Amino acid sequence: MPGQRRSGAKAGRTGRWAALAFALAAASFASCRGAEGGAAPATGGGGEGGEPIEKKPPAPIQYGEGKRIAHLANGAIDESSGLAASRCNPGVFWTHNDSGGRPRLYAFNRKGESLGVFDVRAGAIDWEDMAAVKIKETSYLLAADVGDNFSLRGQYALYWLEEPEVAEEEKPAVPRRLDAEAIPFVYEDGSHNCEAAAVDPATGAIYLVSKRKAATCKVYTLPGPLAEGWPEDGYTAGEPARAVAVATLRIPTVTAMDISPDGRRALVGTYADAYEYARAEDETWPEAFGREGRRLAMPARRKGEGISYGPDGRAIYLTSEYAPCPLFEVPVLENKADGKDE
């Protein structure tokens, strides 16, 4: 696939990430590596005497009315298509532009202030979404080059990279360079337009939701670099990954997706409202997507294609494909039955 690049050695995942770490150090900036953490694996289990544990999703969060809280100061962000809350830089968000833009990530804070520009060594046919995830002790970003309005592309690409540290102020203003692991892939059932991608922190699996004007859409999954099933030497354009359909959702025109930092909730966004799915501790996401999503009213916005849980995994943030780019917040009603896990 044009523009795809693979970082690191070809002697296995360990060698590739060692090479990537060296490249990051040579570029004089650090990635976000911290203490052991992340979501617990989604596995089956039992109570005393081996009795199965009841599948009980977390209680619903009560959200308040969404409103615009800022405009993004960086005027280059004129088609914010993906949005993600940092897993290691407190109060930092990430976004990127839609098709026609460079493979570039923008960092900003809740006030809309620019905190840096980062060029990714990757291809960029039509970036449509991104995700942030913390797996064990390291935070990662995923950029999804998956747009295909006319379903003509034979192959698509995801770009996986360690999340860099971001300063509280934008310096230097010159874009910094980031290496990325390319994940070329195909769908098991042909070409699809897609604008929604997320990563499960419990398993490292990547989820994609197709964009259709019909009443339904499909959820697909494929392994990420840290997931079970990832080949030792990764994937290539000649041997791409295969995205497999695992669920059908009764939602038209899906434009965005996110999975909460604890791996228990998923948002599926549209140009209007969003739908929230909750996963019990012993459930898989395909099982959780088998239930109806909870419809959430989102603030009115023009061409809203970015959605993300906040850093705490509770409040919801949104952007729009217009300049100056607005930042919306849907807060949590703390004095209500706020949905804390039991």
Set out the residue ranges of the language-model regions.
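Compositionally biased, intrinsically disordered low-complexity segments
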Residues: 1-3, 14, 25, 42
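Intrinsically disordered, low-complexity regions enriched in Ser/Pro/Gly/Gln/His and often acidic
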Residues: 9-10, 25, 120
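Serine residues within intrinsically disordered or low-complexity segments
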Residues: 7, 28-31
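Bacterial N-terminal signal peptides that target proteins for export
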Residues: 3-19
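Sequence/structural signature of beta-propeller domains
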Residues: 32-342
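Bacterial N-terminal signal peptides
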Residues: 18-28
